[in-house]
């Protein structure tokens, strides 16, 4: 009896959502393509009328030759007040700040009422990176992706993260499940709910974010941390998962995870020395000893994927004043704390080369502006 009443309630809510989407120019399908604690993501279709009035939407969908989008519906009744006040606005603002990068999921528009918020997003139809790694591993009868494919995908991911950092955004929840693939196999970084704006490069944060398996050791130790360096640790975990088919450290308890981290990653036989060196460089226990994005871009393992780049690095950080309405994580409850970053030199001669591409080349891998 109770389950029947729940089904009727769900049907009523879905009908309301269909009506609200229709009123805003979208045909909501019943196909659910994702879900979170208090949100669901559905496949939807943009109407011709909506595309006429939304240049961002029409320019992107023209290139894709379809009208499909993903609509994320957040239940404001189920979401905690902190999520509605802090995390949802950060997600929206970070997606707006990173608009046009080809490896970051595009936000076309938002609308809301007292009960729900709707985010109209670019559709990435081939699932997430974790699903892709598992599917390829099954086909190959060997764990992980081949290094050439891992290199191609990792280039795109590094490009997306470099662009985020260049506009002052740290993601803080980088993991395989938050990296989607579109129908052409391109990476689409998503889920910016924990993203934060850092006005100064060496600002320190203190909020524990993300999944333990991808979380930097300084965060596990409850220390204040540099968000960019924490993102770099997560990149190392993701690369290891790509080429090995499994996470390098897996424990639910932070103190046990730290013990595994101190022992260092274990690599599968046959993995190239260059790839091992890059992963070790990213998974340094001490944040200041970790490779930065400039060094990642210049690493010898990355060189064969140079064709993925498009323009120039070392560009000055762009300031996005739209973030001024959202308090950075280190203002509440944290105090504004900064440190001078001392970057150690790389221990491996294979890691850097002055002839390799610079970071601006990574940051600028975005889509051209739509034609007017």
Swiss-Prot record:
Listed name of the protein: Testis-specific serine/threonine-protein kinase 5
One annotated GO molecular function: protein serine/threonine kinase activity
GO terms classed as biological process: cell differentiation; protein phosphorylation; spermatogenesis
Role of this protein: May be involved in a signaling pathway during male germ cell development or mature sperm function.
Transmembrane segments: none
Catalysed transformations (reactions): L-seryl-[protein] + ATP = O-phospho-L-seryl-[protein] + ADP + H(+); L-threonyl-[protein] + ATP = O-phospho-L-threonyl-[protein] + ADP + H(+)
Active site positions, chain numbering: 173 (proton acceptor)
Main enzyme class: transferase
Residues that coordinate or bind ATP: 33-41, 72
InterPro entries linked to this entry: Kinase-like_dom_sf, Prot_kinase_dom, Ser/Thr_kinase_AS
Residue numbers spanned by region Disordered: 314-372
Organism name: Mus musculus
């Amino acid at each position: 009896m109770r389950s029947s009443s729940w089904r009727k309630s769900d049907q009523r809510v879905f009908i309301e959502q269909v009506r609200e989407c229709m009123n805003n120019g979208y045909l909501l399908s019943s196909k659910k393509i994702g879900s979170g604690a208090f949100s669901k993501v559905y496949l939807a279709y943009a109407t011709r009328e909506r595309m006429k009035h939304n240049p961002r939407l029409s320019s992107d969908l023209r290139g894709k030759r379809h009208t499909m989008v993903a609509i994320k519906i957040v239940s404001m009744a189920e979401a905690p007040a902190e999520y509605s006040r802090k995390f949802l606005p950060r997600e929206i603002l970070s997606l707006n700040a990173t608009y046009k990068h080809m490896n970051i999921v595009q936000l076309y528009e938002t609308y809301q009422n007292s009960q729900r918020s709707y985010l109209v997003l670019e559709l990435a139809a081939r699932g997430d990176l974790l699903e892709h790694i598992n599917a390829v591993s099954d086909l190959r009868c060997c764990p992980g992706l081949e290094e050439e494919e891992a290199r191609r995908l990792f280039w795109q991911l590094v490009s997306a993260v470099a662009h985020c950092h260049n506009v002052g955004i740290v993601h803080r929840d980088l993991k395989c499940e938050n990296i989607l693939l579109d129908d052409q196999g391109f990476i689409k970084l998503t889920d910016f709910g924990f993203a934060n704006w850092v006005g100064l490069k060496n600002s320190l944060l203190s909020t524990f974010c993300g999944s333990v398996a991808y979380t930097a050791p300084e965060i596990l130790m409850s220390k204040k941390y540099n968000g960019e360096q924490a993102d770099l640790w997560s990149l190392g975990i993701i690369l290891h998962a790509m080429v090995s088919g499994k996470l390098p450290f897996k424990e639910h308890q932070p103190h046990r995870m730290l013990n595994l981290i101190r022992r260092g990653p274990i690599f599968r036989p046959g993995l190239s020395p260059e790839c091992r060196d890059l992963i070790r460089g990213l998974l340094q226990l001490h944040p200041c000893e970790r490779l930065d994005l400039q060094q990642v871009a210049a690493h010898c393992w990355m060189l064969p994927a140079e064709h993925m780049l498009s323009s120039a690095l070392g560009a000055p950080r762009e300031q996005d004043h739209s973030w001024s309405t959202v308090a950075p994580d280190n203002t509440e409850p944290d105090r504004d704390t900064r440190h001078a970053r001392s970057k150690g030199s790389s221990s491996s001669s294979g890691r850097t080369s002055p002839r390799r591409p610079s970071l601006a080349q990574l940051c600028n891998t975005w889509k051209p502006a739509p034609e007017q």
